[in-house]
Amino acid sequence: MPSDGRCWETLRALRNTSKGRLRYDREWLLRYEDVLEECMSLPKLSSYSGWVVDHILPNTSGHTQESAPSSDNSPSSGSASGLYQSSLLKSPVRSSPQSPSPSSPNGTQSTHESPFTEPIAPQSSRAIKVEGCIRMYELAHRMRGTEGLRQWQEEQERKVRALSEMASEQLKRFDELKELKLHKEFQDLQEVMEKSTREALGHQEKLKEEHRHRAKILNLKLREAEQQRVKQAEQEQLRKEEGQVRLRSLYSLQEEVLQLNQQLDASSQHKELLSVDLAAFQTRGNQLCGLISSIIRTTLESGYPTAENQAEAERALQEMRDLLSDLEQEITRASQVKKKHEEEAKVKRQESQVQQGPAPPTQTSAPSPSPVGAQNEDLQVKVQDSTMQWYQQLQDASAKCVLAFEDLTSSKDSQTKKIKMDLQKAATIPVSQISTIAGSKLKEIFDKIHSLLSGKPVQSGGRSVSVTLNPQGLDFVQYKLAEKFVKQGEEEVASHHEAAFPIAVVASGIWMLHPKVGDLILAHLHKKCPYSVPFYPAFKEGMALEDYQRMLGYQVTDSKVEQQDNFLKRMSGMIRLYAAIIQLQWPYGNRQEAHPHGLNHGWRWLAQVLNMEPLSDVTATLLFDFLEVCGNALMKQYQVQFWKMILLIKEDYFPRIEAITSSGQMGSFIRLKQFLEKCLQRREIPVPRGFLTTSFWRS
């Protein structure tokens, strides 16, 4: 139809325009969703819709009626018109009022003006048809785009669903693979654990087998060891029984030797009858007693006596018997000689009755000194009578002091007990605090002890204490103070030799102001260390052996005697304290006042020790300790006489000590010998270590 041809021409003309040559992107919908949303939004009326209704629609209806017959023949035109009308109703006019109108039939163009200025001339039917075609094209294009978009969306949804399903399936496969992997790892781990368990069980079985094997071997060894132990125990028990038998035998031998020695001492009443010196028999008897005592001490330290020890003791006993037998023979012979002399004298008296005056007395010559190394006849074991009287007086004074405060110590009253404890602490604690720290500190301790003994109150344990709290307080404090001084020598000085001097100077100062304390110090010292007298206690008939050992200074606990080394250590400490006391005076006291127990007592002690038979291991130890502490002071006091005594020790006393000292006890003897030889070589006794100088008292 002519109208269709014109439409296509119009379309070709439009395609040749600048806008028609524009290329449109088919995929714009994916990138410009906002444009699609704008197209799908509800239509809005243009500002020219009112004008179109007033001017275009009336004219359009007239043309429609005129072309109705032709419309029947041209369905495409009708449809186009319908579409056009519908497009007018659904969408606003796209062209602006200023857009140019289609060309007129005569080829001229008319310009539309604004409806607000002047009315626009209605378009021709051709223009309307063209515009309708355009709108129909746009509608068709829009429908195709919408359909394509819908299909694309459906396709995308299908793809998304497919991808989701695929991802879900992949996730399931991943979970299955993971579960499979975990299951496999668990199986591998279980296999490894089972393998390890099997290996461990195998190793355990192997260890059990080795353990059973070793246990079997060990049981065999244990049985062998048990058999060996039983055998050794039986041998030890047998040896112990034999040793106990030998020890009892040694004690019996010692008791018999001591009894024989007493018989020797009892023979002194026949001294006037004997032509020989009785001291030689007594000296040898004492040596034999000391020999057996040293054998017993040595065996107690080492265990039990051996057969050689018993044989040696039996030889000593036999020698003692022979000695007593010889003495008895000498006494018998002397008695016979005396009887014969008496008979001759009787005859002579009868013959000389006619003679006037008695016969001149015979003079006895003085004994000549024995050569070095020979048996010295004037040495003895017993102490001098005057010394024994002095010793006994001190012990009696100590016993009276104990009786004086017996009510205080035995009281059941709590207040009295408290007073006793406070007094004991006030007396003993200051002595325990004595040291070489400073002279001022030592003076404070001395003043505190002096105040306590003087009846003044002193502070002890945060309380005020005085001896006036109890009538027996002073005796109790004096006794405990003296006991503590000696105990410090027994313990502190024995371990630290330098401690002898500060303790001794305080004791010496207290002794000068309170003489009773000094006597009690000597009593305690003599009781614990009889060698400080010097006094060698004798074994008496009927005396228990333990009591005799206590008299000698040994500590006996549960029938067990202390070791010899510990015994010598305690004796050494007390002798050192005694040697320090006799040479020191309290520096703050009266210098003109004589020492209550000075160096003259040290000289007496040394002389009496040298006049007595030495004891194995004891004499050498105590001589060394005494001379090391007090030798310098004695040298300055007695000078030449002191060196004569040192030479006497070296030349005459050393051989005696060496004769009774066994090979295992030579240490103390060698130490004494080297000390004296060095002193004789230097012609000086060195100042003892720890001696308190004048600078100490200024500290």
Swiss-Prot record:
The protein, known as: mRNA export factor GLE1
Origin superkingdom: Eukaryota
Sequence ranges of Basic and acidic residues compositional bias: 340-351
Keyword annotations of the record: Coiled coil, Cytoplasm, mRNA transport, Nuclear pore complex, Nucleus, Phosphoprotein, Protein transport, Translocation, Transport
Subcellular location: Nucleus; Cytoplasm; Nucleus, Nuclear pore complex
Region (Interaction with NUP155): 1-29
GO biological process: nucleocytoplasmic transport; poly(A)+ mRNA export from nucleus; protein transport
Disordered: annotated span: 62-123, 334-374
GO molecular function: identical protein binding
Primary residence: nucleus
